[in-house]
Amino acid sequence: MRDALDRLEFLSDYREDNRIEAKRAQGGLPHSLWETYSAFANTLGGVILLGVAEGEDKSLYSVPLFDPQELADEFWSMVNDPKVVSVNLLRREDVQIVTSGRNQIVAIFVPRADFRHRPVYLGEDPFTGTYYRRGEGDCRCPRHEVEAMLRDRADPNPLAGLEPASR
């Protein structure tokens, strides 16, 4: 996914999918960014592109951002707030300001969360704040899936210590 940074000048070659999400972000960080962060972390990971819009043909294109660095700083402040999101999975290099065409965009690389951190959820309630990625959309996780993630987190190896049955 990171090698995509080298090709962001060809942004129109990309489409939103289960690993790429475009956000205009011209009015600041959109609330839906956090749903996508949760969804990517709980699924396969992906990249969120701030300052990018989707055309009628579904191709992506950059739009001017007032202050990309301010957006990145605001993101860092919020991703470290447990009232916003349950865990920060990112390293400094996972948030980059890159040039695409004549505009700068903010690329946020969200890794898939390790089972010990899942579910990654918004707010304080995993049952209402956990999302997963389906195609190009973020969907709220059903209760039974959240329960399964919590169970896996508590007991990552439920078969440890068991002996094979004798024949």
Model-identified regions with their sequence ranges:
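Conserved N-terminal catalytic/coupling substructures associated with nucleotide/phosphate chemistry
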Residues: M1-R167
